[in-house]
């Protein structure tokens, strides 16, 4: 955690030729654009496999561990970014304007009049890296596995929950029959896997896909090696239908300490570093051969409360503080949080104060609470709310309804400096209410999270242009089947009204009506107090301009490089000083851009659906 394109919408014949021509000119203009229109950075090292010249290696520093290479279960942002490089998706977001769709594995599509049957044409020029052809049967098998195997639903089950039947009448035709209309049918942000490989996997839920290399895929890169918490290595897929990447190797190298990653960038040991702190970004400003990219963020950063962990079978588990079951208590906590201070002091201006659930980058879905509804910073009101709700203060300590002092456990990510910095403020602000806060920062927050063993936690998901996945995280269907299972739930929310609104928005094809429903969902989520958005942090990243000549940001204006809804950044990247080599074989040069233009022309000719796609883990937990 998607796109727009033909389908249930009226096709407009007039203007298509003009629009296509304009789009071609726009994209051709991209080719001639100065380097400032892109990001830059890459490195060179040993000789190429053929012994000719030096090998161009693009090295990306990452802080988040890649816990699995299984596309059915990957939800971490680091892992879902790898999936986009390894496997093709049915459709792609346009890198210049993510509100538009481009063909991916599917070259075109159509829908029945009742919008319940979707037929996709699967391209005939895609090949698995082991030499076998990609067919519609691979896509049908992928979706059917997700429909019938609970383990395979973990990452993207929301896409198939409404599927009735998926078939492949022939190698080039995929047919999906729905139970009811579904607005995300051009946003099926699902990695399609090779049936002949995955049918051999006995337990999808436990399979990590990290033992046999290279991993068979059909994306722009082929994963050749992985060592947990050390690196992930890729080589370019020379047979990728959109054109081979220009770099000889792409390496994601793990740095637990982001200061060490920044130091490596300065030394030229890595090409690119994401998720910079304000201090790190400031230290790089003006540095030779280094460019800092400060892009509008596509994720939210929030506080999530434990509302009482439970499973679909009704069993409760975990050990969340019982005071958090009280909406007034939750609201009081958030009245004591000064979001402006968080933005000014922790983010140092590299972000926007939190309000609704969807970041302001997505204007159609961005929601603000009314003045009367807003949980504004007001410590006096927070204290009054606690008093009124029965949480009295005695001797400077806030007591629960059993007369015991309240201590809350705050869980944070050890690899995220923002969490650590913000926790100090929260401890102070809640301490003024008489509530003690014990902060624990962990390398892996996943285990206590799924076990429901926390009170409050720092939470964050990347949001795609279509918000379906981050909304699905809070439905009853996202709960684990039993306490021993892992669901897609973010923090165990299950509410009939929210579920009803979710069902309405997924079935609504009218963009404005759907957006209104989504905003109603955001309003409910805000009022519930189950979670509260602190801020929308910018994507602050840096790269070496003496290593990468050009790289595509998404969107083109004020866009990010890391965590895109697609593979555009690494696929398009061109080595500095290697123009002749980079342009051969049609990588990220003019031929590739023209290829995107041609694909966009196809999309324009088919129709324009409002974007409905999901993730880079689209909406992946961070």
Features from the language model and the residues they span:
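N-terminal lobe/hinge region of extracytoplasmic solute-binding protein
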Residues: 61-113, 144, 216
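Detector for C-terminal structural segments
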Residues: 2, 41-44, 227, 334-367, ...
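Aromatic- and charge-enriched surface segment that lines or borders ligand/interaction sites
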Residues: 107-152, 175, 261-264, 322-324
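Alpha-helical secondary-structure segments
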Residues: 135-142, 173-177, 219-220, 248-249, ...
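Gly/Pro-rich hinge or "lid" segments in bacterial periplasmic/extracellular proteins
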Residues: 96, 190-245, 249, 379-380, ...
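Surface-exposed binding/hinge segments that line
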Residues: 50-53, 121, 155-201
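Ligand-site clamp/hinge motif
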Residues: 237-284, 427, 436-438
């Amino acid at each position: 955690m998607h796109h727009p394109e033909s389908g249930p919408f009226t096709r407009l014949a007039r203007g298509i030729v003009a629009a296509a021509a304009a789009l071609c000119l726009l994209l051709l203009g991209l080719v001639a654009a100065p380097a400032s229109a892109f990001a830059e950075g890459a490195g060179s090292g040993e000789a190429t496999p053929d012994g000719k010249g030096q090998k161009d290696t693009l090295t990306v520093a990452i802080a988040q561990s890649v816990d699995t290479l299984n596309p059915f279960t990957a939800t971490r942002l680091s892992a879902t970014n790898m999936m986009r490089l390894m496997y093709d998706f049915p459709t792609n977001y346009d890198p210049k304007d993510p509100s538009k769709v481009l063909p991916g594995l599917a070259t075109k599509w159509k829908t029945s009049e009742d919008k319940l049957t979707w037929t996709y044409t699967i391209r005939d020029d895609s090949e698995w890296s082991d030499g076998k052809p990609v067919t519609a049967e691979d896509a049908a098998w992928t979706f059917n596995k997700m429909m019938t195997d609970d383990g395979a639903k973990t990452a993207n089950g929301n896409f198939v929950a409404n599927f009735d039947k998926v078939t492949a009448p022939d190698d080039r035709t995929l047919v999906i029959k729905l139970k009811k209309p579904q607005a995300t049918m051009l946003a099926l942000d699902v990695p399609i896997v090779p049936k002949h490989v995955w049918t051999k996997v006995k337990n999808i839920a436990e399979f990590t896909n990290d033992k046999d290399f290279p991993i068979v895929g059909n994306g722009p890169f082929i994963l050749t090696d992985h060592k947990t918490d050390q690196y992930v290595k890729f080589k370019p897929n020379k047979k990728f239908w959109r054109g081979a990447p220009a770099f000889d190797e792409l390496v994601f190298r793990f740095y637990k300490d982001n200061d060490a990653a920044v130091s490596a960038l300065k030394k030229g040991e890595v090409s690119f570093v994401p998720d910079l702190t304000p201090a790190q970004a400031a230290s790089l400003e003006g540095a030779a051969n280094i460019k800092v990219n400060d892009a509008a963020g596509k994720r939210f950063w929030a506080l999530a409360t434990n509302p009482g962990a439970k499973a679909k079978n009704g069993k409760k588990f975990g050990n969340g503080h019982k005071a958090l079951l009280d909406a007034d208590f939750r609201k009081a906590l958030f009245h004591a949080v000064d979001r402006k201070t968080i933005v000014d002091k922790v983010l140092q201006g590299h972000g926007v104060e939190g309000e609704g659930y969807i970041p302001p980058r997505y204007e159609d879905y961005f929601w603000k609470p009314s003045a009367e509804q807003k949980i504004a910073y007001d410590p006096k009101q927070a204290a009054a709310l606690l008093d009124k709700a029965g949480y009295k203060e005695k001797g400077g300590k806030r007591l629960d309804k059993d007369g015991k002092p309240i201590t809350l456990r705050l869980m944070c990510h050890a690899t995220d400096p923002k969490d650590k910095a913000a926790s100090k403020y929260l401890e102070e602000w809640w301490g003024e209410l008489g509530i003690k806060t014990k902060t624990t920062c962990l390398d892996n927050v996943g285990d206590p999270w799924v076990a429901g063993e926390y009170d409050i936690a720092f939470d964050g998901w990347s949001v795609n242009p279509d918000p379906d996945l981050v909304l699905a995280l809070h439905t009853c269907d996202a709960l684990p089947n039993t306490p021993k299972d892992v669901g897609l739930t973010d923090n165990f929310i299950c509410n009939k009204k929210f579920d009803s609104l979710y069902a309405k928005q997924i079935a609504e094809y009218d963009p404005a009506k759907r957006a209104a429903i989504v905003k109603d969902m955001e309003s409910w989520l805000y009022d519930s107090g189950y979670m509260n958005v602190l801020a929308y942090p910018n994507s602050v990243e840096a790269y070496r301009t003496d290593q990468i000549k050009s790289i595509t940001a998404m969107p083109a204006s004020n866009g990010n490089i890391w965590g895109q809804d697609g593979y555009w950044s690494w696929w398009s990247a061109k080595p500095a000083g290697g123009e002749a080599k980079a342009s051969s074989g049609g990588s990220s040069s003019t031929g590739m851009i023209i290829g995107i233009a041609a694909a966009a022309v196809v999309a324009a000719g088919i129709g324009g659906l409002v974007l409905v796609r999901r993730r880079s883990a689209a909406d992946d937990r961070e």
